[in-house]
Amino acid sequence: MTVTTERIARIIESKEIMTLLPHRYPFLLVDRVTDYEEGKWLTAIKNVSVNEPCFTGHFPDQPILPGVLILEALAQAMGILAFKTHELSNKELFYFAGVDEARFKRPILPGDQMMLKVEVIRERRGITAFTGVASVNGEVACEAKLMCARR
């Protein structure tokens, strides 16, 4: 007889996200964490609304979520994972410290649900290196290697 145990997703709702990250509207770019494993990976979503402030200028007749905001959303997802992994004081923050090999493969548009996945590559002396992928409907929109620094 084989007993299988199904892993239950670890969800973090927006109210708890706001206790972990200092960001607020319009710069809080993670709506919900759909699952995570401390020190390893995290998946989350950002529902992209036509009412996002960036769309008034990027671009008025053809709104596209700016690539830097996609990268910031990935960094925020990593920040949530870091706060769930480490016991940190309220005064400590994770700063976006670097980005390498960023590739943008499709635009993210109003109405899209952006899926975020971050995975830790290594962590050393307060610096976390990780990979990030943002996708829509299973199609990769952006992928990059990023770094966050704990201060």
Swiss-Prot record:
Q: Which GO terms describe its molecular function?
A: (3R)-hydroxyacyl-[acyl-carrier-protein] dehydratase activity
Per the record, the coiled-coil ranges are: none
Task: Name the Pfam families for this protein.
Answer: FabA
Q: Can you list the GO cellular component terms from the UniProt entry?
A: cytoplasm; membrane
Q: Which keywords fit this entry according to its UniProt record? A: Cytoplasm, Lipid A biosynthesis, Lipid biosynthesis, Lipid metabolism, Lyase
Q: What class of enzyme is it?
A: lyase
Where does it reside? Cytoplasm
**GO biological process terms, semicolon-separated:** fatty acid biosynthetic process; lipid A biosynthetic process
Catalytic positions are: 58
Q: Which residues form the signal peptide?
A: none
The EC number(s) this enzyme carries: 4.2.1.59
Q: What is its main location?
A: cytoplasm
* Catalysis performed (reactions): a (3R)-hydroxyacyl-[ACP] = a (2E)-enoyl-[ACP] + H2O
- Please indicate which superkingdom the organism of origin belongs to: Bacteria
Annotated function: Involved in unsaturated fatty acids biosynthesis. Catalyzes the dehydration of short chain beta-hydroxyacyl-ACPs and long chain saturated and unsaturated beta-hydroxyacyl-ACPs.
Which HAMAP family does the entry mention? FabZ (MF_00406)
Q: Please state which protein family the record places this protein in.
A: Belongs to the thioester dehydratase family. FabZ subfamily.
Q: Which NCBIfam families match?
A: fabZ, PRK00006.1
What is the designated name of this protein? 3-hydroxyacyl-[acyl-carrier-protein] dehydratase FabZ
